[in-house]
Amino acid sequence: MVTIVEVKQHIKKFAAGNELYLQEVLGCHYENDIYTFRVWAPNAQKVWLVGDFNDWDKSLEMSQTLDGVWEIKTSLPKEGQLYKFLVKQADGREVMKIDPMAFELEPRPGSAAVIVKLPNKKWLDGAWMGRNKRSNHFARPINIYEVHASSWKRHTDGSLYTLKDLQKELIPYVKEQGFNYIEFLPLTAHPLDASWGYQTIGYYALERTYGTPRELQDFVEACHKENIGVLADWVPGHFCINDDALAYYDGTPCYEFSEKWRAENKGWGALNFDLGKPEVQSFLLSSALFWLEFYHLDGLRVDAVSNMIYRDYDRSDGEWKTDKFGGNRNLEGIEFLQKLNRTIKGKHPECLMIAEESSAQVKITGRIEDGGLGFDFKWNMGWMNDILRFYEMDPLFRKFNFNLATFSFMYRMSENFILPLSHDEVVHGKRSLMNKMFGDRDKQFAQLRNLLTLQMTYPGKKLLFMGSEFGQYLEWRYNDGLDWAELKDELNAKMKHFDQDLNSFYLNEPALWQLEQREDSVQIIDADNKDESVLSFIRQGKTRHDFLIVILNFTPVDRKKITIGVPYAGKYCEVFNSARKEYGGSWNQEKQNLKTQNNSFKNFNYQVQLDIPGFSAVILKPVDVHIKRRINRKTKTK
């Protein structure tokens, strides 16, 4: 039972920006046959509780308590009934508003809150949670399958899959394909499917079309039992502009900036949170912790970080003002993100905090004490943009743009990166990942295999949007399922098989993930072979014997007896080849077994010669190499 004194303490912390469990005091709470409703509307003239239980009339007027919070206690409501707050705003208008703390909203097009009791689940994922707490995420494989919950698959009658359906089908599919994380586009309540969830109205409510809170808990638990982590996109920078939601809640700026130019997000038709306001900080910090703790999520991907840390983001000259230092930084946004990560990591250091951010000015994954934002990982948007431009162009011109394939090696240690081939790149006329590739259908599949091998062997964690694993031809459509019928086509089926083998290869080769935070985990063999458009590099594991040699051919020309430098004399064998017939290619030769020649190549004392099929990626591994043992000589002291 929460006492009056405890409620006051919670509200004081809320007003100071330090409340981490706001859902325990604001919103709807049931105790001893009495429901208590509280809502923050500091400049409202009056607030009424309206709902099914009082025919939506003004019979239940709320009382203002402290720090702008209104309260009422009543025994009239029943579980399952709908309610809203009728707010007489500062200008005298009376507007129906959602409960910002609601755990469930009614089906669309309505937005009323549903009176619910959250399930008190007895979790059975202790083994996963324990391993996760002991794990060093930077030195383990992370391979993320990005999913939009309502468009992965549909029933034959066109109806949506729920989380219960996804538990039966998505989890075994992800496990079979070799991904070890699922990342959902936002699961929070939103009024329009076309927003994909990024126009949030309910920061504590699961989107009703996806299922119930218990179904999400069960889904996460089932994932954990299969050693699959679950991440979700979360949008703390901007919110839906709808009049019945958070926008100008009491007729004045509550959640948004008071300065109109800062509040308006014209590009997205949204409103920006005032991240410097203490009450907003409490609201968002509590939301983040709620999703991580109540649903056992393993991390959050924070959307649109650039919009939160730059005043001039998506604004023309004259549409923004400088900060107090004369710069373009949103200082409040930077401080909030540092506070967010400090809070999450203080309570749950095992949870992944991931930033979607496209600039290179602020140290996103840097330590907070050094001025960084404190995220674990950042999407490598530079790599993604460069590499997709490279693969879209005619291979004849790739030698003139070879830096697009190699430049990201220069800054790979600047942040902890995730390499995203995400939903944003396969929609709005950008074409599917497969259909971006240059040439006819066979060449497109060959280059998609090449691209995914580059992604999997390049330093950084991995993310792939659903459908790309089998080479879907059409763009992603949020209002339909993936085109699963394409798997009847031999090329698509073989592409899916290829992705399965590639993911398994990644998960089982420590050289691809064990030392990613070290400079010496990657050695460039040859990044200058522009004329033949062949790139080669080494990925190094913990032991000197544990390394892989990656060779990528970005043209359709088979390269015979091409020379590659290697670090040690001995024997090497081919362990992966993206052009093999089983994957949809035409290469049917035996796996290559190679002996070194005592000729130097670039910075290497030895070399091998091998055949590289057109548009292929080939990976070599040492079989029997001669590595001189390092001798540590102790210096005698007098």
From Swiss-Prot:
It catalyses: Transfers a segment of a (1->4)-alpha-D-glucan chain to a primary hydroxy group in a similar glucan chain. The keyword Repressor does not apply. GO terms for biological process: glycogen biosynthetic process. InterPro entries: A-amylase/branching_C, Branching_enzy, GlgB, GlgB_N_E_set_prok, Glyco_hydro_13_cat_dom, Glyco_hydro_13_N, Glyco_hydro_b, Glycoside_hydrolase_SF. One of its GO terms (molecular function) is hydrolase activity, hydrolyzing O-glycosyl compounds. Belongs to the glycosyl hydrolase 13 family. GlgB subfamily. Catalyzes the formation of the alpha-1,6-glucosidic linkages in glycogen by scission of a 1,4-alpha-linked oligosaccharide from growing alpha-1,4-glucan chains and the subsequent attachment of the oligosaccharide to the alpha-1,6 position. This is 1,4-alpha-glucan branching enzyme GlgB. It comes from Lactobacillus acidophilus (strain ATCC 700396 / NCK56 / N2 / NCFM). The lineage of its organism: Bacteria, Bacillati, Bacillota, Bacilli, Lactobacillales. The gene is glgB.
